[in-house]
Every structure is written in C-alpha cells, then in structure tokens.
C-alpha cells in the first residue's frame, strides 16, 4: 500500500479535566514526569464479613472524561457514519449461529495486577483490527503498561526532554498504580505500541518490576497503531454504542466492581450503588430482553427494566464470569457514561509520527 505521512499529531494528544485521584507528580529540571506520591490500588475487592474474598485485580482511575460526555448531535463527525445501521434487539458474538462474520479472540487474564485499563484498551483495539482489517492480533498489555509509566524520547526526537518515570518509594509496583483509557490513548497515539504479545509476553510482568524492559520494545516492535478514538455517552446514546460495537467489535467502559452485585447462578451483574473498585472492561454485545429478574431474587435488587450488555472481562475464564463473559444491566448505576471506541490500524499505515508531547496527562502536576 502507498504509505503516508502523519503530521499535526499533537492536537489529538491533549488530555484535559483530569480529576486529582491517586497520581501526583513533580516536574524536574529535565522536564521528566516522575511519580512521587501514589495511593495504593488494591488487587481485589474490599469485602465485608458476608462477602467472600476475590483475587481479581482492578485498577481503573476515573477521570472527568469518563463521566462528562456530551450527547451526539447531527453535526458530529465520525460518529454520524454509524447512524444508518439497523440495530437488532440481540447481538451476541458468543451465541451459536451468530452471523456477524467474526469470532471473539481468546479471553485474557490480568491476574494478579491492576492492569485492566491496558487489557480493555487493547481488547477494543484487537477487535477493531479484526472488524476493519480482518487481522487477528494478540497485543501486549505488558508493553503498553510498562512504557506508559517508563517512556522516553520518540525516534524522531520530537518529545526530547519529556518522559514519564515511576519512582514511588512507597509503592514501586507500576503494575498496580492503575490507569485509564486516556493513558492508553496518549501512549498508543504516540506509537508506543501496540506490540505483539509474543514480543513482550504478560508472563514476564513480575520480572519487569526488578529488571525492567529493554528500551527497544518501546517503539520498535509495534504491529498496530491507534489511529483515532472517540467517546459515546452510553446513558444517553445507547443505540449509537450498539452501532459502534457492530462496526468495530467492542467499546471500552469502566464500572465499580462489587462482589455482592454479581449473581453466579445467572452470570449477571447489577450494581445499584456508586461504590466498589474501579475496573475497565469491554462491551461486545447486548440483549434487550435479558430479564431484570436475572439480577437478583428480591425485587429491591433488580433494575426497573430488562436489558443487558455482554461484557468481556480480563479475569480469566471463571472469575465472576462464564468463560470470561458476563451480563451487566443497562441500568447499572456504577457504569461510567463514556464508551470509548478505539480505531486501530496495522502498523504500516504511516511512515512517521511527528509529535511534541511526551506526557501522559496535562494536570495533577504540583
């Protein structure tokens, strides 16, 4: 294919309105961004005496971008391309007889680290590649997580003087610092990955805590690029979210995980509170007729209406899911407003990426 030149990338990389949560940093003389004070991200759900322990790890840090999402208008850009699609009442790629023309990739497992944000971002990217380019990729979550927190100057030198370094003496495990879709978007649009899983396998995660990763893995092993992304308000524009799933395979969302909100007998989740641990997942389907009674035997534990999203998790095949998937009520109170659509392309789409911003956030700086 004829290769092109990518210019003016800086404008797409700005992040604004970050809520001060757990990540704080100081600027140094070399303009390096260093993590200096970090609140621990628990590996599992905080449970009461009536709840069983779970080993599943969370780690999603919500921002205002997750909640403040405008409704779509007729003048919106790429979103408007989805409006002609007819939306069925059921869309389930896991069901036998599914006619969508693709098969979902194998379920991943983030255990035991708080890297759900990387897993959900790359799951959406993998499905985007599958739907748009019929390309099956297993992208490296470890490469994305590591170089999001350990970045250096890009190959063309545009980000010289900018870097991100994780140096918290109180909690040096970058894998449990948490993250969000904004972090993933900025890293991936900087062409930090996405690399193939075979190049930087997740099985080496523990070793990176002491020995790190060779710098060559930051920019030299990419097999896919994040070309664009956008957000849809899943609460006000659920039909547009469904159209995006049909076209691109998945959307990334976050919610607050509570063990008691999950029904093991029906594989259904409904959190009617705004408490729990932040967790990122992908939505790959839906069922408008999924009964509200599946979410609890008591009417007080049930949503007011039928309908559920088909959630792809990253906790392996049997942790609060069946074969890595579960159903979440449309009415879940903890579900973030933003559904993130990742538009990935094969890595040979452009020759160069001219950029000047090597940070991962633009606020929370002391």
Could you say what each language-model-derived stretch is?
Residues 1-2:
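N-terminal secretory signal peptides that target proteins for export/translocation
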Residues 12-13, 90, 97, 341:
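Intrinsic disorder/low-structure terminal segments
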Residues 5-24:
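Sec-dependent N-terminal signal peptides of Gram-positive bacterial secreted proteins and lipoproteins
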Residues 95, 112, 117-126, 145-298, ...:
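Predominantly the structural core of cysteine protease catalytic domains
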Residues 10, 102, 238-239:
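A generic local structural motif
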Residues 19, 25-199, 247, 252, ...:
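Structured alpha-helical subdomains that flank or immediately precede key functional sites
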